Amino acid sequence: IPVISEIEFAIQFTDAITVGITGSNGKTTTTLLTYHLLKQGGLNVGLAGNIGKSFAWQVAENKHDIYVLELSSFQLDGIINYKQHIAILNNISPDHLDRYNYDYSLYINSKFRITKNQTEADYLIYDNEDEAIQNWLKNNTIKANKVPFSLITKPENEGGFLEENNMNTT
């Protein structure tokens, strides 16, 4: 019998779009901000994952069209079939290494499980300046559309960047 995460369990009971957010730092802030923007935009959105009420509870009690999920590496490790339409990877730095036999590459792989089941119709938004993310993407293939963001440089193709204190997109 496979051991799955609560996220993997709950997704079986909803057809909602999910936005999954992970990273070593800034998950909660990014998740709350994303939820707030979607809610203020008039969308029927729920907030769950590693924040607030569990995703399973939300799915059982509410019928949201979209769920914004904060996802820890622990939750991502229990993913088998779950995928989100939009994955956001803030950054990766050495954290929880005791769980990964003190092997940073195992932790990085855990964070990239957020892309595991994505297709060409999905999106990965990621920090284009994060060395661990850049190295992993150079050596691995994902199916999702890659959308980098940067506070320093303008992405070559599609993405977001900071210029003259304004966030812009290409």
Where are these regions (language model features)?
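Phosphate-binding loop of NTP-binding sites
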Residues: 2-144
